[in-house]
Amino acid sequence: GKELEPEKFSQLDLSVFEEKLEETEEYQKSKNYYDSIFSAVESKSEITEDFAENSEVEDKPNGSFELSTNGKFSVEEVRNFALANQITPYTVFLGAYEYAVAKFTNQSETTVCTVTHGRFDKRLKNTVGMMVRTLPIHANIDEEDTVSDYLKKIRKNIKETVANDWFPFMK
């Protein structure tokens, strides 16, 4: 093997950087972004359980659900649909999930969480540590939207949320 290069930017360096970031305009911009979305949110995207889990009972309603295509389309069809609509397959499935959660919870808006690798600064490329960031993705469901328009809104939400990921999810 090759000799490993020493880290140029450690997990400790990242922590110090993030602490100093709180004093910047970029941090405030990210905080304002989340405030503008979530300050008036009154929806509840939590899936309510009907019954306590019981592994001995088959096909009993519980607090989970899964999306299934029943084999109705292929990976290639999803990829082609995404390309034709200038989105990613990830956006297709996140949009489907958000829509299903909205229907399941009888809400017109949802918030679900996703994660990113958290290594957007190129100095973190070879850093050892947990950089994963949890990001809340909010969606407003408008039944008048076409599927394409709805998914483009999801794509926009993802991009804006990732661009503002410096503001910690827990704050």
Kindly label every feature range from the protein language model:
Residues K8, E49-E53, T114-G118, K171:
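A general secondary-structure junction signal
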Residues F9-G63, D145:
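Short amphipathic alpha-helices and their capping loops
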Residues S10-S15, M130-P136:
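Short acidic (Asp/Glu) and glycine-rich catalytic loops that position anionic groups and cofactors
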Residues E26-K29, N54-D121, V132-T134, I141, ...:
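Gly/Ser/Thr-rich phosphate-binding loops and adjoining beta-strand/alpha-helix segments
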